[in-house]
Amino acid sequence: MARNEPSSQQPSSSGSNGTPAQQNGSAKPSKVTVKVVNASFTKAADCYVEITSDTSSAAPKKTTVKKKTMAPEWNEHLNVHANESSTISFRLLQKAKLFDDTCLGMAKLKLSSLTRNENGEFKNDINNISLLAKDSSKIGTLNIIFSGYPERKRRSAGVRAETAASASSEASTSNGVATSSSARRPATAKRDTLAAPTSTAAAAAAATAGGTPAAGAEEQLPDGWEMRFDQYGRKYYVDHTTKSTTWERPSTQPLPQGWEMRRDPRGRVYYVDHNTRTTTWQRPTADMLEAHEQWQSGRDQAMLQWEQRFLLQQNNFSADDPLGPLPEGWEKRQDPNTSRMYFVNHVNRTTQWEDPRTQGFRGSDQPLPDGWEMRFTEQGVPFFIDHQSKTTTYNDPRTGKPVGPLGVVGVQMAMEKSFRWKIAQFRYLCLSNSVPNHVKITVSRNNVFEDSFQEIMRKNAVDLRRRLYIQFRGEEGLDYGGVAREWFFLLSHEVLNPMYCLFMYAGNNNYSLQINPASFVNPDHLKYFEYIGRFIAMALFHGKFIYSGFTMPFYKKMLNKKIVLKDIEQVDSEIYNSLMWIKDNNIDECDMELYFVADYELLGELKTYELKEGGTEIAVTEENKLEYIELLVEWRFNRGVEQQTKAFFTGFNSVFPLEWMQYFDERELELLLCGMQDVDVDDWQRNTVYRHYAPQSKQVTWFWQWVRSLDQEKRARLLQFVTGTCRVPVGGFSELMGSTGPQLFCIERVGKENWLPRSHTCFNRLDLPPYRSYDQLVEKLSMAIEMTEGFGNE
């Protein structure tokens, strides 16, 4: 389609100084000089002013930082791109060293209010602007002076003027289509009614030269409808046919197929979806239905993935089992009382809990390699000596597995500490402390959060140990476990939803959950946290999984473990990097002006917390910086959530004591609560990038060979080690998220062959040293995963 050229006879608006208008009716921004004179506010701070224009995409302009003052003076000139209709935003920010800069107050100013009566020029007077906090309270003032001559805007036909003074009775031409005065909207600032356009010429005139409708063009109101403004300037709509009003703009578009509009006894409009037999107050649109379908599809996919989670992998030795078949003369059986798997050796007529393919019992009859010797400690524990390297180890060199004494349950002590053994002990505690009969919980699918709250909180907490009998209203039937599993999924999806303001995501790209310090906006939040504590305890006691999990530091709190600096990496990488810099450098050589205080923002209000008594007067030095780091880390995970955490633990302990969980570490607790899923190694390998390695490097080949040899439990532990969570995203490994957004798993060559591997969970990165053999790689990786915190251990 040929482009339409503007008419050469197009008139220019008054006061435009002869500058031709653009076809879309907007003015080309020109430079305006803003002199920031001074400011005054109620609290001394290191502050600066940031200026932006809504008609410019340039970076914000900033003044210099003024130190520790309540009345900073700048007298600095800043140039911004703006026209007469621009809105200039001013932000007074407090400079921070470790955290993001905090906004103390802000203000907005329309240039049209300054140039309206001055023929487009500024009066060069001082403008006193009030600075408002996020709660709209005044915190101070800012004095500024404007100079320059902003470009004036030429009005196109059909585009509504922004001020009453810009209204004109002259007809104008755009794209060769003339508009009459009756087709234009009135330009008065306030009016009780606003008539809908009655001519198609107005719509045509509102089009730009490219054929795009003008900004702000609205759909024509249906017959019998009228738009009005209330006393606060808010739009509402009057239906003269039914003599009713509504805040929602009526549409001339027909309802989607299967929908019907009805009115309740009070005359309110609602909509019936005959497809799903549901109702809603909101008028359905094609976009809304499409978004709902996408949400439903995503939820169904998440539900499907959740149903595939498991806690312990079933040892069904299929043909494609990476461990291969059992040795000749061996058989796997199941204990009918505990359902625990054991192995029978028909050759010597013995039984054992260990899988002979992984525990090395076949290799124990083979001779030791040259230069090796086996000895025993005074307690009878075997160990091995390598006379060539003059080292000792508890690992049998023939199998690579530890050999140790028998524990209290007849298996090796190393095996006693395995995840399976811990689960068996925990399940024994739950079984021996269960209560006879069942407890019935009846809820509605449409109100599962509140219904479950009423059911759980009105029952005696000990009764929640009974066998669960879940029933959804209108869905009569027997619950043999499937309904309970669905209830745990649906309810966990609701109670952990950040929309309720009880929990919040750990970061922009970290969807693990932590308690929201601002949860007090809900007056009953402590009761809800007690309810959630009971619910989480029920999930663990009855062996059910929840939809989403918490941060690792929260699991450590549940286990009463000390939170350390490394734990902050997953939650806030910026603070972690800052504290690591302080830890690794001599801060006495640079004037950082750090004190034992922490500033933070809560619901728009800036607060200061003393890390120790008199912290505002205690400077951080090289001598006391470790104490500062320790106190800051502890404060970071406890700020504003002490009462919520206490309520959560109160609810949890009312079902069963947290001491029962002391068998597990924080990673195992996450597996116990959220379950694990089959890890697709092929998908993982396809979505991996390499640094200083190539996909064909022998270390990379060994790594994937080792991953394929692992069972699902150990793969989940490896996934926790490198990404911080045992769960694979719904879209697979291609959807892995890092601290800065989507970030694929990465293997990087770092260190020497005697180093342990390191993980960076914020970046989904594994630092893999250049090991010389497959056995060395397996030994180092296994040690790093099982015996370390996962970062920085060498």
Curated annotation (Swiss-Prot):
Domain (WW) ranges: 219-252, 253-286, 324-358, 366-399
Biological pathway: Protein modification; protein ubiquitination
InterPro entries hit by this protein: C2_dom, C2_domain_sf, E3_ub_ligase_SMURF1, E3_ubiq-protein_ligase, HECT_dom, Hect_E3_ubiquitin_ligase, WW_dom, WW_dom_sf
GO biological process, one term: regulation of protein catabolic process
Keywords: Repeat, Transferase, Ubl conjugation pathway
Disulfide feature: none
GO molecular function, one term: ubiquitin protein ligase activity
Domain C2: 10-124
Tissue specificity: Expressed in neurons localized in the head and tail of adults.
Entry annotation: catalytic residues: C762
Domain HECT: 460-794
Comp. bias intervals (Low complexity): 1-16, 161-186
Classification via Pfam families: C2, HECT, WW
Compositional bias of kind Polar residues: 17-27
Catalytic activity annotation: S-ubiquitinyl-[E2 ubiquitin-conjugating enzyme]-L-cysteine + [acceptor protein]-L-lysine = [E2 ubiquitin-conjugating enzyme]-L-cysteine + N(6)-ubiquitinyl-[acceptor protein]-L-lysine
Role played: E3 ubiquitin-protein ligase which accepts ubiquitin from an E2 ubiquitin-conjugating enzyme in the form of a thioester and then directly transfers the ubiquitin to targeted substrates. Ubiquitinates klf-1. Required for diet restriction-mediated lifespan extension, acting in concert with Kruppel-like factor klf-1 in the intestine to perhaps modulate genes involved in lipid metabolism.
PANTHER family: E3 UBIQUITIN-PROTEIN LIGASE SU(DX), HECT DOMAIN UBIQUITIN-PROTEIN LIGASE
Protein's UniProt name: E3 ubiquitin-protein ligase wwp-1
